[in-house]
């Protein structure tokens, strides 16, 4: 699992130049095989959390994925909302914040190298995948793809 996450994050950042939100959505969709409508990816491009320095795109991407995946698995909206809230709480407890400007290793400076959050992205997507496996998949009785 970690090997695939690490490989895909690196590829999406350095070969595709995707944002953290889009990278999160794409990697999670590859792990769990839902069909994400192209408009979901298009909408995620507009979030671009890192440039606004508010809620981390790694959180936003996972919340978008939970909503989309949950609906595809016929999980009730109320349960999806509860799962998203629970994810936010657990992410904040684990990583210390939900805010991009607090999670980003070196803050925001013009001389920052590209994809400064690659290590954090790999950790956050692994955390998100574990959350989905433990909290959402048991509700759907599905197993994660290889």
Label each region the model flagged:
Residues 5-31:
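Active-site-proximal helix-loop elements at catalytic-domain edges
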Residues 7-15, 45-54, 74, 108-113:
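A short glycine/serine-rich beta->alpha loop
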Residues 24-44, 94-102:
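Acidic-glycine-rich active-site phosphate/pyrophosphate-binding loop
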Residues 31-42, 68-83:
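Phosphate-handling active-site elements
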Residues 41-43, 53-54, 74-76, 85, ...:
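Domain-level signature for proteins that mediate thiol-based redox and metal-cofactor handling
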Residues 61-69:
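DPxDG-like acidic metal-binding loop motif
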Residues 80, 85-146:
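C-terminal binding/interaction regions
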